[in-house]
UniProtKB/Swiss-Prot annotation:
Protein name per its UniProtKB record: Ribonuclease P protein component
EC number: 3.1.26.5
Reactions this protein catalyses: Endonucleolytic cleavage of RNA, removing 5'-extranucleotides from tRNA precursor
UniProt keywords, alphabetically: Endonuclease, Hydrolase, Nuclease, RNA-binding, tRNA processing
A GO CC term assigned to this protein in UniProt: ribonuclease P complex
HAMAP family, alphabetized: RNase_P (MF_00227)
Organism, scientific name: Synechococcus sp. (strain JA-3-3Ab) (Cyanobacteria bacterium Yellowstone A-Prime)
SUPFAM superfamilies (alphabetical): Ribosomal protein S5 domain 2-like
């Protein structure tokens, strides 16, 4: 589970990201992000995940993917630029990704959006 300050839960924030967020796309994920409203400077970035039924009709598979993404994001949260809201939306082919591919996809999108304070080393395949 992501630490509480890094979780994006507000419905209005999700809607604002869908409507006005900047978009970066990868092969298996879409990243929507935008700065937090004025007065929220210095607050840690918040991350939300969307795993729709297009990914899989099985809730078990969707929840497993959600847990995997959270575990990839957990150590990255302190390295995110403060003051942003992020939303990761999965594409249907993301279920086929192995762990190293999934890590690389998340890192690639965060670097593409220039949201990492210090670039973390590329994940090593295990």
């Amino acid at each position: 589970m992501l630490p509480a300050p890094y979780r994006l839960r507000d419905r209005r924030a999700f809607q604002a990201l869908y409507q006005a967020g900047q978009r970066r796309s990868g092969a298996g994920l879409i990243l929507l992000f935008q700065p937090m409203p004025a007065g929220c400077e210095g607050i840690p970035s918040q991350v939300g995940l969307v795993i729709g039924k297009k990914v899989s009709k099985s809730a078990v598979k969707r929840n497993r993917l959600r847990r995997r993404l959270r575990e990839i994001l957990r150590p990255l949260c302190p390295n995110l630029k403060p003051g942003y809201r992020l939303l990761l939306i999965s594409k249907p082919n993301l279920l086929t990704y192995k762990w190293p591919e999934l890590q690389a996809e998340v890192h690639r999108l965060l670097q593409k959006a220039d949201l990492l304070v210090s670039p973390s080393p590329d994940p090593e395949p295990s």
